[in-house]
Amino acid sequence: MSDLHNESIFITGGGSGLGLALVERFIEEGAQVATLELSAAKVASLRQRFGEHILAVEGNVTCYADYQRAVDQILTRSGKLDCFIGNAGIWDHNASLVNTPAETLETGFHELFNVNVLGYLLGAKACAPALIASEGSMIFTLSNAAWYPGGGGPLYTASKHAATGLIRQLAYELAPKVRVNGVGPCGMASDLRGPQALGQSETSIMQSLTPEKIAAILPLQFFPQPADFTGPYVMLTSRRNNRALSGVMINADAGLAIRGIRHVAAGLDL
């Protein structure tokens, strides 16, 4: 039996991309899974696909009341909460400082930070009492942009660096009761969108990047699927496999940190 059997897991943005992969993986592990999802159509799809195995709540991660409503439903259903995974986010399609008009930069900043940073903070606030009671954990989705430049424009990169500070501070504030960690995936096949303020709300990340471009820059030389990143979340959630890690950020970058100066990888001819 999985370590996560009957564990109560709350994931934001579970309707597509990495969020959907996490929903699938935790259900496979036998967990009781809930998600807060903005899209009514995706909520309906989740309910149709997973039935009683999913508690799908329509709501906005920038609204504390929506979080509280979801947590109340989780506690009614499961009687507890073991892990909160803050995952919902938006990207800026590499919108640069120089080429973005000042007024758009300002409104784009507020929209992107509301989702990528405030959304995490509000989720942590709503979930903290239940997680303190269960001595559970929080996990926040980062990005390679939390470590390196060029994984987005200044708005997205700054938001992911802000999230690393949030993880460290919450890990400090909530210890010893709650473990708080992060996972930073590299580019993958997803439907990640951008801020409406930048005119990117209908533009998917895969319209800016191709599988070939992503694979070419990664030393492991493959195009990751969302499911490729679910393992670290499972490990961090498990009390048996992770008793000792808090304030840790796993850089799941397919080897990007060891990319060579002369070649992307030295073993291409092996």
Curated annotation (Swiss-Prot):
It catalyses: 3-(cis-5,6-dihydroxycyclohexa-1,3-dien-1-yl)propanoate + NAD(+) = 3-(2,3-dihydroxyphenyl)propanoate + NADH + H(+); (2E)-3-(cis-5,6-dihydroxycyclohexa-1,3-dien-1-yl)prop-2-enoate + NAD(+) = (2E)-3-(2,3-dihydroxyphenyl)prop-2-enoate + NADH + H(+). One of its GO terms (biological process) is 3-phenylpropionate catabolic process. Keywords: Aromatic hydrocarbons catabolism, NAD, Oxidoreductase. Pathway: Aromatic compound metabolism; 3-phenylpropanoate degradation. The active site is at residue 156. Its EC number is 1.3.1.87. InterPro entries: BphB-like_SDR, Dihydrodiol_DH_HcaB, NAD(P)-bd_dom_sf, Sc_DH/Rdtase_CS, SDR_fam. It comes from the Bacteria. Pfam families: adh_short (PF00106). Substrate binds at residue 143. GO terms for molecular function: 2,3-dihydroxy-2,3-dihydro-phenylpropionate dehydrogenase activity. NAD(+) binds at residues 10-34. PANTHER family: 3-PHENYLPROPIONATE-DIHYDRODIOL_CINNAMIC ACID-DIHYDRODIOL DEHYDROGENASE, DEHYDROGENASE/REDUCTASE (SDR FAMILY) MEMBER 4. Converts 3-phenylpropionate-dihydrodiol (PP-dihydrodiol) and cinnamic acid-dihydrodiol (CI-dihydrodiol) into 3-(2,3-dihydroxylphenyl)propanoic acid (DHPP) and 2,3-dihydroxicinnamic acid (DHCI), respectively. Belongs to the short-chain dehydrogenases/reductases (SDR) family. HAMAP family: HcaB. This is 3-phenylpropionate-dihydrodiol/cinnamic acid-dihydrodiol dehydrogenase. It comes from Escherichia coli (strain K12). The gene is hcaB.
